Amino acid sequence: STNYDLYKDGLKLVTTIDAEMQRYAEKAMQQHMKSLQHAFYTHLGKQEPWDKEKNLLDNAIRESEVYKNLKRQGLGEKPILAAMNEKKPMTIYSTYQGETEMQMSSIDSIKHYLKILQPGMIAVEPQSGKIKVWIGGLDFKYFQYDQVLAPRQVGSVFKPVVYSAAIEHGARVDAYYNNEQKSYPEYDNWTPRNSNNQYGGYYTLKGALSQSINTIAVQVLLQTGIDATIEHAHRLGIQSDLPAVPSIALGAANIPLREMILPYLCYANNGVSTTPYYLLSIKDRDGRILYESEPPRRERVIPAEQAHTMSSMLSAVIQEGTGKRLINNYGLNIPLAGKTGTTQNQADGWFIGYNPRIVVGVRVGANNSRVHFNSTALGQGANMALPIFGLFMQECLQSNTYAYWSGLSFPVPPTDTQKELAVPTFK
């Protein structure tokens, strides 16, 4: 009932954040984002994102505080734009150098910030639900928009939910599905395509998931049922509204990173859902406890065997699928599972990866989704987000604290399922 001043009353907030792990995460983020931002500038060349998106820059200018302040002073459009085009000394944030003093106009600074790619990253202990890492963006002083909480299109990181629902409803992991491009008359002749535009052959569930085959993800969704898949997603912890359309198989829904990791926490924790939390206690200046967290809610939402099957299938993503650069580029030939995700027009790149002790989610994209790479090779999750996970894991494994992670292993699925998983994934 007492009102406290967070800044003056000497309150002590004890959180679950692991200072060592957070340090490794920030180092990995900064290293990759400098490289990625440079690649983005090189990719754009002389073409600006607003050259084709005419109202992109205009909207950003009119939404700026500078424009609004001048408008409140009674200035008209032309005087406002003239004032905003005047160069003056200002401090801006650069991905390469941090705070930098420059001569720049207000409009130039708006252009600068429009092109900056932002990371979001969260790491959670699946058994306890303790949030160990939280990175909401490049620098909180300049970017208060928290990328971990921002709802964004999720792309293929949603596919494991589709396959998990299918297995729950009786799909066999050794059944083969035709990688054919087809139209769906009942859905306005919607014709999903694969990102590489390659078709043909037959894949098992494991093969289709590891190679992120869109055509088969849609088949699997419709075989299970859209409503049944949505119910399964909600049970695994996703609370966001999911449109009852077949494109959810390809991740058309907008879901925050903090929420999208919840199914993966469930797979890593043997089918038990645990609510992530970050605040342990609040004490006053005399050490009296004002708040103490309750143990997080734990609930079995899928059988342990089903979770083990999903971890086995998601391990194949790393060993032979879209996440294999974790082995090739980062030397992480250890038990890991995960999934890449790339959204429409490469607006966002995702990667969610885990071992039995930690689940890590990463998303990278500009604040405005109309600012993006125009190349799938550069804008895919394996290039945008996965490297942060790879660098982070390297740092952890080189430390005394987390070196033991390299010796961890996932629980094996039941014998019959192991046999199903062992069949060739493509024919």
Regions found by a protein language model. Give the residues of each.
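C-terminal substrate/ligand-recognition segments
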Residues: 114, 119-131, 158, 164, ...
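Short acidic (Asp/Glu) and glycine-rich catalytic loops that position anionic groups and cofactors
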Residues: 2-8, 140-142, 186-189, 210-212, ...
